[in-house]
Amino acid sequence: MQRMIEISSPFFLNPDELSTPADWAAVFGNANPLALEIGCGIGDFIARTAADNPGTNYIAIDFYNKGCDKTCRRLERLAIPNVRVVRDEARKFIVERIPKGSLCAVHINCPDPWPKMRHRKRRLVNREFAAFIREYLAPGGDFYFATDFDDYGIDVAEFMPGVEGYANMLAPDRYRHELEGYHLSKYMMKFMAEGKRIYFVHYRKTAEGAA
C-alpha cells in the first residue's frame, strides 16, 4: 500500500471538490484549450510541455501520491502556472470531471505494460480505451501514446487503424521510434540508455469522430 503524503500545493486539486463535470475555465482562470496527461510520474514531461505551450491548460493525473507530490514540487520550483495535478484513477476521473469533446490533447507516456500474458487485459490502452477517450477529445484533438515495451507499442499501433474517428498522424508509418518536438521523460531516457526503443503512436480525432 502506498504511503499517503499530504500535498499542500496550489497546483494540486482534490477531485472530490470539483464539479461534475469540472468547470476548467474557472479552475485555471481562463478558457484556454485543455490537455490531459495520464500518468505524470515525476512531472518532467508535463513541466517541459506546459512551459513550451503557455496558451494551453494541462491536467496531470497520477494514481500514485508520491508522483503527484514530486510533480507539484517541480511545477512550483519552475513557476509553471498552466498545470494542475490530480491524484485519481484515470477513467473514473475522466468520466466524472472532463466534459466530452473538450480536450485538445491526451498524452500517455510509458504506462504499466503488464508484461505477463495473463495480465495484459489490465493494460490501460486498448481498442476499447481508444474509442472511450476519443469521446473526450475535441475534433482535431491529438492522442499520443508512448511505450518502451515492444509488444505494447506494436499492439497499440496495430489496433489503432481499426478505431473509428481517428487519423494517423504518422502515416504511412504506424509508429515511430522518434517524435520530433515531443519531450522525453526521465524514464524514457533511462530506457533508451539501456538500449530500449520508444514506440510513439500519434492519432488525431477527425470531424467524423465528433461526439
Curated annotation (Swiss-Prot):
Record: active site: D112
Molecular function GO labels: tRNA (guanine(46)-N7)-methyltransferase activity
UniProt: S-adenosyl-L-methionine binding residues: E37, D62, E89, D112
Top-tier EC class: transferase
InterPro entries, alphabetized: SAM-dependent_MTases_sf, tRNA_(Gua-N-7)_MeTrfase_Trmb, tRNA_methyltr_TrmB_bact
Keyword match NAD: no
Enzyme Commission number(s) from the entry: 2.1.1.33
Keyword Methyltransferase: yes
UniProtKB keywords: Methyltransferase, S-adenosyl-L-methionine, Transferase, tRNA processing
Pfam families attached to this UniProt entry: Methyltransf_4
GO cellular component annotations of the record: tRNA methyltransferase complex
UniProt pathway: tRNA modification; N(7)-methylguanine-tRNA biosynthesis
Catalytic activity: guanosine(46) in tRNA + S-adenosyl-L-methionine = N(7)-methylguanosine(46) in tRNA + S-adenosyl-L-homocysteine
Positions with a binding annotation for substrate: K116, D148
Domain of life of the native organism: Bacteria
Primary role: Catalyzes the formation of N(7)-methylguanine at position 46 (m7G46) in tRNA.
Entry's family note: Belongs to the class I-like SAM-binding methyltransferase superfamily. TrmB family.
NCBIfam families documented for this protein: tRNA (guanosine(46)-N7)-methyltransferase TrmB (TIGR00091)
PANTHER family: 3-DEOXY-D-MANNO-OCTULOSONIC-ACID TRANSFERASE/TRNA GUANINE-N 7 - -METHYLTRANSFERASE, PENTACOTRIPEPTIDE-REPEAT REGION OF PRORP DOMAIN-CONTAINING PROTEIN
Name assigned to this protein: tRNA (guanine-N(7)-)-methyltransferase
Provenance organism: Geobacter metallireducens (strain ATCC 53774 / DSM 7210 / GS-15)
